[in-house]
Amino acid sequence: MESSIDGRTVSVKVKLHMGYAYENIRLGLYLLEDGLVYNQINSTPYYPEITRQGVWSDGSVDVIAFGFIHNDVLRHTFSNIFGDVVSGNNVGHDKVYTKEFQYSIPPNMKLENLKLVAFAADYEDRYIINSRESKIGETQDFEPID
């Protein structure tokens, strides 16, 4: 996976190197953001330092974790949520499939908190074959799996 940013436009190239001829393989790419701070309901004993009873804007009362930090928040899907179909001509032992994506990042997202997650999935069995995560601007080589 290779990515670069120009202004607020991110460009990503994802390569899928296959060791097996999957019948129905898909390639997906997500943009995630870390560090989003929002209140949320907390019905667990965790985070007692930020949890107390509170009132929502609609007047309802709840146990709220105030200022909870959300990480790995899905902000954009470059592909179909289940991944884009990799056509039969591109599937097979030792074949490499390449797909390029682009996205204009809205101003409400912090560039330094963004990361990419690419995955290869067997759509029929709903099975993730492999995945990679990287910051924008990083280049990663293939990661073989057995």
Regions flagged by a language model, labelled:
Residues 1-146:
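Short, conserved sequence motifs used for protein processing/export or organelle targeting and
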